[in-house]
Amino acid sequence: MQLIKSQVIFNQELHTYTLNGVQLQGITGMIGRQLFSNKYANVPQSVLTKAANRGSFIHEVCELTDDLGVFHESEEAKNYNALKTLYGLRYETSEYLVSDNEHFASCIDKVYRESDYEFSLGDIKTTYQLDKEYVRWQLSIYAYLFEMQNPGCKVVRLFAIWLRGNIHELVEIERVPDNVIVDLMAAEISGLQFVNPYSVHVGSNNLPAKYQEMEQSIIEINEQAKYWADKKKELTEGVMKEMVSAGV
């Protein structure tokens, strides 16, 4: 199945999205306003600019590798290729634009094909620390819009592609349910503050933040272990069937 191309026009220089002359909102702005308003409050603008430029460069060299087979000498580009090989990622497209054609639009870093109707979405992160909660919301919104734009298609996996120097990890992310994403968008459209059902309130009964992060990591590791165990079983059964058919 071929993916549907959005009619929304993306101006890369101004980073704006327009449809029939009407400007749509990007996803990053909504996430910042509704969920992570103080994420970079104490970071100097010069540092943010430098990080953004570095991130853009790494995105570009990875895209060159995917689209043109041009292998850049940077460590991140080499590590990205290593991750693709290790996990058997079947590249479909980069910067895939998705939209509800009314309010929101955004470009997905990476789309990988799992089957004729199943896809995985990846987002490249180059930060010092990987903010899994941020990328969870980002990719979940992408998944919702992706399936809306491509009826019959299913997003089966979401993952962050963490590339920073010698760090290269593919981190699978749990999807936020669609009904929660719908509520988030409705709040943004109405000019209301979204109530995050996953937010942790400070109190005597809550675990310290570092233990909460450890607990979340354990959950994600278990989910990844289950996925690859299922894949191993699927491949093993396939080999056995071929051996039986061949009379081995």
Descriptions of predicted regions:
Residues 46-48, 127-130:
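A short glycine/serine-rich beta->alpha loop
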Residues 89, 117-119, 155:
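A general structural motif
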Residues 13-15, 117, 166:
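Beta-strand-connecting loop/turn residues
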Residues 135-138:
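Short, conserved glycine- and acidic-residue-centered signature motifs
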Residues 58-59, 106-128, 142, 221:
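Conserved catalytic cores of phosphodiester-cleaving nucleases, focusing on short active-site segments
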Residues 93, 121-123, 159-160:
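A structural signal for short, well-ordered beta-strand segments and their strand-loop junctions
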Residues 1-107, 113, 230, 237:
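Metal-dependent nuclease catalytic cores that hydrolyze phosphodiester bonds in DNA/RNA
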Residues 100, 131-133, 144-247:
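Metal-dependent nuclease catalytic regions and adjoining charged, substrate-binding loops involved
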